[in-house]
Amino acid sequence: MPKERRSRRRPQPIIRWVSLTLTLLALCRPIQTWRCSLSLGNQQWMTAYNQEAKFSISIDQILEAHNQSPFCAKSPRYTLDSVNGYPKIYWPPPKGRRRFGARAMVTYDCEPRCPYVGADRFDCPHWDNASQADQGSFYVNHQILFLHLKQCHGIFTLTWEIWGYDPLITFSLHKIPDPPQPDFPQLNSDWVPSVRSWALLLNQTARAFPDCAICWEPSPPWAPEILVYNKTISSSGPGLALPDAQIFWVNTSSFNTTQGWHHPSQRLLFNVSQGNALLLPPISLVNLSTASSAPPTRVRRSPVAALTLGLALSVGLTGINVAVSALSHQRLTSLIHVLEQDQQRLITAINQTHYNLLNVASVVAQNRRGLDWLYIRLGFQSLCPTINEPCCFLRIQNDSIIRLGDLQPLSQRVSTDWQWPWNWDLGLTAWVRETIHSVLSLFLLALFLLFLAPCLIKCLTSRLLKLLRQAPHFPEISLTPKPDSDYQALLPSAPEIYSHLSPVKPDYINLRPCP
């Protein structure tokens, strides 16, 4: 019977481990992600022009056609603005997980980069319009586009190849308030067939890939087009800011037209000094999850549920500590985020109330001046002596409002995570930091014990030796029989025994051992 019971109990740990393994595999299954490519420019053609408004007008036409299309009722509405001559295109991004484009080079630089080594961003040769100093190199109009890609956060720096050097475009993916409508020339888009075709393309692909962002692609069958509006355009010579060594790249051509679209040949550079030529890059929406041949990226679920569970099983109490710390950190982070939003709303409401109060005070002062002027004109004194009541002005205290402006974000004032030395931010996730914290704690504890081990051993041994020395010493008692001489030598003599009892010495008694 005992053997049968043992055989029945043996499969239970195996079943537990199998179920635990299946659970971990279910938690770590790959999730399908959407990846989009965003590219500007082409190696086969290049266009140089002077005014950034040309590009913004064309994009404005496309966005306006998209916004007014009946097929895009549920799609996001795109808006456009131009600040300091640079177009800005953005739309409110929905909330979602952090996802990056497959062809994008992700960086964490908050400012635009200059394409020349050692040049400051304010002294970049190609930062603004072309100048005389740019005649010895290629000039490509520098555009800054602020795009809100769906389900994307962070800062991107995308590069594309253009003859001469590799310019950089920085996409700042953060929330921007809706600007007023730009004051661009109102062009009649009825005679522009490409605008309607692009809008139709956007409408069709937006429903097919809702998680993909707008993509500018130079791939066929689309080609760059130049919009001609009330201007006769001719192109000849090496073009604007084109060096003599590359003159064989340029094809000379001329045409006379006042409106419509002109399809230029490849490697054709236009030298246009007026704001009537537009370069329209082809626009399409591509889902790289099916088109890309790259293997899909394996995305795990929350590290709190998968990796921390493995750490808890392997490390024991350390893993449990990491899991609890990661969960508490995640909850505290979400709580701080909500509190920051509420704090910002309260500060905005208080500032608006303060602004309204200042307006009320100014209106009251204006009414007071008007009443005083009216009373004096009618022959009376001012308002206060006439009604025989004290008149007071509202004194508004601005100290508390100033303190609100000096408040730091709640995430900087409340420490919810383990601080690195000198407040270094290594860009690690919460569970990784908690794991490193626990491992370092155990490592430091082990080092502390190793340093104190010799001292502890020495103290313990000295204490034991001291206790052994202070203990009473007893003679050894042997149970084996010894010869008579040994017993006689160990026992005292009779005179020595009776000498303490009486002064009279008794007769000697011969003592012998018992048989």
Curated annotation (Swiss-Prot):
GO cellular component: host cell plasma membrane; membrane; viral envelope; virion membrane
All ranges on the Extracellular side of the membrane: 34-435
Glycan attachment residues as annotated in the record: 129, 203, 230, 251, 256, 271, 287, 351, 398
Post-translational modifications: Specific enzymatic cleavages in vivo yield mature proteins. Envelope glycoproteins are synthesized as an inactive precursor that is N-glycosylated and processed likely by host cell furin or by a furin-like protease in the Golgi to yield the mature SU and TM proteins. The cleavage site between SU and TM requires the minimal sequence [KR]-X-[KR]-R.
Leader peptide range in chain numbering: 1-33
Pfam families, sorted: TLV_coat
Lipid anchor positions (S-palmitoyl cysteine): 455
Motif CXXC, residue numbers: 212-215
Cysteine disulfide partners in this protein: 212-215, 212-392, 384-391
Gene Ontology terms describing biological process: fusion of virus membrane with host plasma membrane; symbiont entry into host cell; virion attachment to host cell
Record InterPro entries: TLV/ENV_coat_polyprotein
Quaternary structure, from the entry: The mature envelope protein (Env) consists of a trimer of SU-TM heterodimers attached by a labile interchain disulfide bond.
Physiological role: The surface protein (SU) attaches the virus to the host cell by binding to its receptor. This interaction triggers the refolding of the transmembrane protein (TM) and is thought to activate its fusogenic potential by unmasking its fusion peptide. Fusion occurs at the host cell plasma membrane. The transmembrane protein (TM) acts as a class I viral fusion protein. Under the current model, the protein has at least 3 conformational states: pre-fusion native state, pre-hairpin intermediate state, and post-fusion hairpin state. During viral and target cell membrane fusion, the coiled coil regions (heptad repeats) assume a trimer-of-hairpins structure, positioning the fusion peptide in close proximity to the C-terminal region of the ectodomain. The formation of this structure appears to drive apposition and subsequent fusion of viral and target cell membranes.
Protein's UniProt name: Envelope glycoprotein
Species whose genome carries this gene: Bovine leukemia virus (isolate American VDM)
Classification lineage: Viruses, Riboviria, Pararnavirae, Artverviricota, Revtraviricetes
